[in-house]
A protein has these predicted regions:
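4′-phosphopantetheine-dependent carrier domains
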Residues: 1-179, 186-197
Length: 197
């Protein structure tokens, strides 16, 4: 109700709302064995329920952008963040649903960003993600530059991240064979063939 009231107030006092950028996050990292309903609820409510409320409250608005900040963890996982990954997977589903309705939606599965946000306060998580990806996290300036390109492309889902494909493929053996990473695997093999040839 609060989100609907806010959107209604904006409609009365401002020019038409053109876009939504949902970047809320809540963390309650726990190993799967230690997850409980309260932990799941806290993380899902902030990310997924918040996004759903924005979706419903803006259905009558002439939006050109509806951007949801997700995480690379939906593609590669991260120990202790099952609730966070689940919430972000929900955002990906919401973006797909909106696009199927002919509404704008882009879900950005950000890779680690070194100098802004959560990872600046959580070195252990930053180091774990960098190890899984095989590269240093993105710089905030680089992420903002990529955001401009993402908006221009109108993609449904993108995952901007620095990663080393051989490192990632070793940690996720199914990635080397699976359809989800097929284009990356193909490009890596093609680049290797060109280098060797």
């Amino acid at each position: 109700k609060a989100t609907e009231a806010l959107v209604a107030d904006l409609a009365q006092s401002m020019p038409p709302l053109a876009g939504v950028l949902h970047a809320a996050a809540q963390f309650d990292d726990r190993l799967l064995l230690n997850l409980d309903a309260a932990s799941m609820d806290a993380v899902l409510r902030t990310k997924l329920v918040g996004a759903w409320n924005l979706h419903e409250a803006t259905l009558g608005q002439p939006l050109t952008h509806f951007v949801l900040y997700s995480s690379v963890t939906t593609a590669i996982g991260n120990p202790g963040q099952a609730n966070y990954v689940a919430a972000n997977m929900g955002l990906e589903g919401l973006a797909a649903q909106r696009r199927s309705m002919g509404l704008p939606a882009t879900c950005i599965g950000w890779g680690p960003i070194a100098d802004a946000g959560y990872l600046t306060r959580n070195e252990a998580v930053k180091d774990a993600l960098a190890q899984r990806l095989g590269k240093a996290p993105l710089a905030a300036e680089s992420a903002l530059d990529q955001l401009q390109s993402i908006w221009a492309e109108d993609a449904g889902h993108v995952t901007p991240a620095n990663f080393d494909w051989p490192v990632l493929a070793r940690l996720l053996p199914s990635a080397a064979k699976g359809s989800r990473f097929a284009q990356l695997n193909w490009r890596y093999q093609d680049a290797n063939a060109a280098h060797d040839g």
